[in-house]
From Swiss-Prot:
PROSITE patterns: EFP (PS01275). It comes from Histophilus somni (strain 2336). Transmembrane segments: none annotated. Keywords: Cytoplasm, Elongation factor, Hydroxylation, Protein biosynthesis. Pfam families: EFP, EFP_N, Elong-fact-P_C. The modification N6-(3,6-diaminohexanoyl)-5-hydroxylysine is found at residue 34. GO terms for molecular function: translation elongation factor activity. Pathway: Protein biosynthesis; polypeptide chain elongation. It is found in: Cytoplasm. The lineage of its organism: Bacteria, Pseudomonadati, Pseudomonadota, Gammaproteobacteria, Pasteurellales. This is Elongation factor P.
Amino acid sequence: MATYTTSDFKPGLKFMQDGEPCVIIENEFVKPGKGQAFTRTRIRKLISGKVLDVNFKSGTSVEAADVMDLNLTYSYKDEAFWYFMHPETFEQYSADAKAVGDAEKWLLDQADCIVTLWNGAPITITPPNFVELEVVETDPGLKGDTAGTGGKPATLSTGAVVKVPLFVQIGEVIKVDTRSGEYVSRVK
C-alpha cells in the first residue's frame, strides 16, 4: 500500500486514520523556535463526517486511502437510496442518506457528480460546483426597500433555501454555488 509523508500533504489528499478514510481540508507546516517541526492539519473523516485538527511530526508517514473518485450521473431517488450511473459502463451505484448528506439539496436529474467509493460503496457525494435552479417561493421585492442588507430568502425547486437579491422573483432561474450555498447570478 502506498504511503504519504508530511511533505506530501495538501488539501484534498486522502489517507487512512484510525481505520477510516480521511481527507485533508487544510494544512500548515509549523517550525517553532524551539522543538521539532510539525504539520498542523484539519481533516474530515469521510465515513463519519467528523472534522478534526491533527498535528503530525515532520517526516511522519500515513497510509494512502484506497478510495476512488468517479464521475457519475445522478439518475433518480427512491424511498431510501439515490442512484448514480457511470456514463460509459452504465454501471449503477446506490448511495444512502448518510453518503449523500447535504448534497441532496443540489442534486438535479442527469447532473454530473463526483462519487467517492471505499470498498466498492459510495461514502461521499460531491455535486457540481454550480447548479441552475428555479425559485419557487420568495417574498416580493418592494421598490425602494434597500435600507436593509439587500437580500431575502428564496426557496428553490429542490427545497434548498438561499439568500438572493431583492430583484429576484418567483419563476426565475438562478445560478447557485453548491460549495457555499450562495447566490451567484440570474440565468438568462
